Amino acid sequence: MQHKLLINGELVSGEGEKQPVYNPATGDVLLEIAEASAEQVNAAVRAADAAFAEWGQTTPKARAECLLKLADVIEENGQVFAELESRNCGKPLHSAFNDEIPAIVDVFRFFAGAARCLNGLAAGEYLEGHTSMIRRDPLGVVASIAPWNYPLMMAAWKLAPALAAGNCVVLKPSEITPLTALKLAELAKDIFPAGVINVLFGRGKTVGDPLTGHPKVRMVSLTGSIATGEHIISHTAPSIKRTHMELGGKAPVIVFDDADIEAVVEGVRTFGYYNAGQDCTAACRIYAQKGIYDTLVEKLGAAVATLKSGSPDDESTELGPLSSLAHLERVSKAVEEAKATGHIKVITGGEKRKGNGYYYAPTLLAGALQDDAIVQKEVFGPVVSVTLFDNEEQVVNWANDSQYGLASSVWTKDVGRAHRVSARLQYGCTWVNTHFMLVSEMPHGGQKLSGYGKDMSLYGLEDYTVVRHVMVKH
């Protein structure tokens, strides 16, 4: 397994403290990797800053060609990446290979094309004798912090737009799941000029802080928790860096009486528990109208009970383990607190799986109330709650009564209601009669404490640029 850092076009061993990397399906240590030292963090940023002098002036075509080459090598090594992601994250191998790798390849290919479509406003004379033009230029060095739930996917979401816009990047994957990012570094070093992409390994305190606080870093992009986002925003405030934050979610799933219940059950069974529920957009907070509530709880409970947890190598496995022992304990604690309320009923699941690995049973909780912690706080595991509501006004207010604002869905056959409710929901994305669908052409990002800035789409590309005005006297 590739375990070296990429700094200035060279693969080098870390000079800091060694950290274990686990296989969450067994609890075994896969290997130990040395963190980047403070000197190596500085070297990576300095290399990126030096490379920016030329990379920032390359043509969109040249950048697109590099991104397309990277997409090709990821596709060619898809099985290798899927196996690494499966071993390090516990994802079912078939899901990593069939679902994630094609989407990752598409992200790089999309931004290769988008790089050639980005432009400013046409020139014009807004002052007599002067011509103005608007430029969209790269910022410089971008520090990208990727999470542990989709390590390679999130690396792609961050690298592709930043590079397409002409920036240079220092990427720090989560210390829990670094293996695919390190493999990506190995393949990228022969495609991009030295220093354009740098990949480090280490914890937030030892590597993340010196990276995001470095005076040569002009932008920090984070996908992570609210707490981490708060820390980085305050940590970078003295140097007035641009920040791009995707900080989690608690997606409301609004099911009206007229919804297609079979579609709802199938959708939540899939999209509430995909990746063991470790997804910011997971369909985890159901609001069911009183006329459909009982039937939905019964049918969904039966469907969730059929979800198969097991070895990531088994083709029939639908749910792998959680990412770490610490996270398993957090999920378990959240469910135990829900049980302790007395009014929340466990329909299925509600316990850790026996045996090796960090497995938690797919869980459905009914009878949750709006103010319950299980409704208000992100669990980030295979846990879905169901809350009864009376009418449209009530459920819209409840759905918006959340610190999160990333994703939501509305299930109804009434087209007017679908438009009306979608317009009022305070979420970056609202799906109607589906959930979880993402495409490279459409923006992904939140409101409120879910953060700001967009991933994917041309809006995502624009986030990695600075708008500049050039005026020429004639």
Curated annotation (Swiss-Prot):
- Protein family according to the UniProt entry: Belongs to the aldehyde dehydrogenase family. Gamma-aminobutyraldehyde dehydrogenase subfamily.
CDD domains listed in its UniProt record: ALDH_ABALDH-YdcW
The pathway it acts in is: Amine and polyamine degradation; putrescine degradation; 4-aminobutanoate from 4-aminobutanal: step 1/1; Amino-acid degradation
What biological-process terms (Gene Ontology) are attached? L-lysine catabolic process; putrescine catabolic process
Can you tell me which residues form the catalytic site? E246, C280 (nucleophile)
Tell me the residue numbers annotated for binding NAD(+). A146, P147, W148, K172, P173, S174, E175, D209, S225, I226, A227, T228, C280
Q: Which HAMAP family match?
A: Aldedh_Prr
Q: Which InterPro entries match?
A: Ald_DH/histidinol_DH, Ald_DH_C, Ald_DH_CS_GLU, Ald_DH_N, Aldehyde_DH_dom, Aminobutyraldehyde_DH, PatD
Under Enzyme Commission nomenclature, its number is: 1.2.1.19, 1.2.1.-
Give the Gene Ontology MF terms in alphabetical order: aminobutyraldehyde dehydrogenase (NAD+) activity; NAD binding
Q: What does this protein do?
A: Catalyzes the oxidation 4-aminobutanal (gamma-aminobutyraldehyde) to 4-aminobutanoate (gamma-aminobutyrate or GABA). This is the second step in one of two pathways for putrescine degradation, where putrescine is converted into 4-aminobutanoate via 4-aminobutanal. Also functions as a 5-aminopentanal dehydrogenase in a a L-lysine degradation pathway to succinate that proceeds via cadaverine, glutarate and L-2-hydroxyglutarate.
Catalysed reactions, semicolon-separated: 4-aminobutanal + NAD(+) + H2O = 4-aminobutanoate + NADH + 2 H(+); 5-aminopentanal + NAD(+) + H2O = 5-aminopentanoate + NADH + 2 H(+)
Q: What else is known?
A: 4-aminobutanal can spontaneously cyclize to 1-pyrroline, and 5-aminopentanal to 1-piperideine.
PROSITE patterns noted in UniProt: ALDEHYDE_DEHYDR_GLU (PS00687)
List the protein's name: Gamma-aminobutyraldehyde dehydrogenase
NCBIfam families tied to this protein: ABALDH (TIGR03374), PRK13473.1 (NF010000)
User: Is NAD included in the keywords of this UniProt record?
Assistant: yes
